[in-house]
Amino acid sequence: MSELRDTRLEKAQALIECGQVPYALRFEPSHRTAELQQAHADLPNGEERDVSVAIAGRVMTRRVMGKLAFFTLADETGPIQLFLEKAALGDAFKQITSLVDAGDWIGVKGTLRRTDRGELSVKAAQWQMLSKSLQPLPDKWHGLADVEKRYRQRYLDLIVSPDTRDTFRRRAQLVSGIRRWLDERDFLEIETPVLQSEPGGADARPFETHHNALDLPLTLRIATELHLKRLVVGGFERVYELGRIFRNEGVSTRHNPEFTSVEIYQAFADYNDMMDLTEELISSVTQQVCGSTLINYQGTEINLAPGWRRATMHELVKEATGLDFAGFSSREDAAAAMEAKGLQTPALADSVGRLLNEAFEQAVEETLIQPTFVTDYPVEISPLARSHRSKPGLVERFELFIVGREHGNAFSELTDPVDQRQRLEAQQERRAAGDLEAQRVDEDFLNALEVGMPPTGGLGIGIDRLVMLLTDSPSIRDVIAFPLLKPESRDGSAAVDNGSTE
């Protein structure tokens, strides 16, 4: 590798001696390659078209055959062939064939011709080095076989893998589609703080940092919920934020400590309205991104057209296990029944409601393949959700499950400041008992609720998991451009990172 780099450095020096700049300031393409392919699809084989074009891109392949050479040049939209002829280029032919390597960025001006084999080509009249590559490209046929290297050196993955490029194009389309859908319905996006003195809005451990000038301990946000609710208190009736969230938790194929979510709040709505909104939003952006609401994920056909199943947590657990948690009067009774079914009963699950959630996670969650709204959660695990209007001990909450994974979480929001204080104080007691993911008491948020918050529906959707679904990606690392990885060791070799801490 070091010899190859030295050779390319020598070529960069030779370019300077020929009057070329190895790293140009600018170049002005007249077209992108896909535009040329489309606009001149009618050019017959073996014919030329006297139209001046200027294109720029990375040299992907090169073939030199005496007085002729053929390069493949690729820009963001795709490849096109360069036809290089000594008779047309003169001395520049020797320069481009001897000093340009696969991986270099070049600009070319010329006309168009289609080869006898039907390949649209730019017949070069002039060329310019734009950026001399000192490192070779990965093998064009096998790409990056090392999965970890794909994540660690994403730039190489993007160069050689059209599928990877398509994944991130679809991600961008999804994000812009969500924003457009919400904006068209009068939702206003407002940024909330990333650095917070009191993290809240989720059961999660935060990343901790310190503000030196203020000598103030801070955390990165674990949710946007509590600040967006403050905005509703302030009079914004439809508000959302799409952005980064940070949780100091394990890493797996479905978890990354830094991830993207959208949280949406609508005044005068409840969790039923948010179910309708979720269904309409996801089906709409799926149609935009995939061209259909019928998609394939890891060999399974998923139908995201509206009309998703809705079922309570109690119903689903009873259906899967035969256990009716409505009939248990104590934790001991529920635990004994679960253990008889072979289900685990962890000590932190210290109530019937928490055991119900355990039974759901162990016996039901992974079976929910088609989109399913799971509704009416235990109050113990939902400290920010409103108590159910007709079911004591439950709250008006749903989670959306698709392919066995949670994709959304929503409530009829708790707007009673007295009830909210009691819930958060109970969470604080759990923290003191060792539950480091339990929520904290946020006095300013409670003060905002005392000012008065209208009835509100709230929703959070994980963007990364939705991108996984719509791009048929098995791991969250496939849809995050630069996922968190263990650093390389000091000798330059990669520390082994199997992608999981679970």
Curated annotation (Swiss-Prot):
Q: Where does Mg(2+) 1 bind?
A: E399, E406
Location in the cell: Cytoplasm
Classify the source by domain of life. Bacteria
Query: EC number(s) on record?
Result: 6.1.1.6
Q: Which PROSITE patterns match?
A: AA_TRNA_LIGASE_II (PS50862)
What does the record give as cofactor?
Mg(2+)
Keyword Protein transport listed = no
**GO molecular function terms here?**
ATP binding; lysine-tRNA ligase activity; magnesium ion binding; tRNA binding
User: According to the record, how does the cofactor bind?
Assistant: Binds 3 Mg(2+) ions per subunit.
Entry's InterPro entries? Answer: Aa-tRNA-synt_II, aa-tRNA-synth_II, aa-tRNA-synth_II/BPL/LPL, Lys-tRNA-ligase_II, Lys-tRNA-ligase_II_N, Lys-tRNA-synth_II_C, NA-bd_OB-fold, NA-bd_OB_tRNA
Q: Where does Mg(2+) 2 bind?
A: E406
Leading EC class: ligase
Instruction: Show the Pfam families listed in the entry.
Output: tRNA-synt_2, tRNA_anti-codon
Q: Which HAMAP family match?
A: Lys_tRNA_synth_class2 (MF_00252)
Question: Which family does the record claim for this protein?
Answer: Belongs to the class-II aminoacyl-tRNA synthetase family.
PANTHER family per the UniProt record, alphabetical = LYSINE--TRNA LIGASE, CHLOROPLASTIC_MITOCHONDRIAL (PTHR42918:SF15), LYSYL-TRNA SYNTHETASE (PTHR42918)
How does this chain assemble?
Answer: Homodimer.
**Annotated protein name in UniProt:** Lysine--tRNA ligase
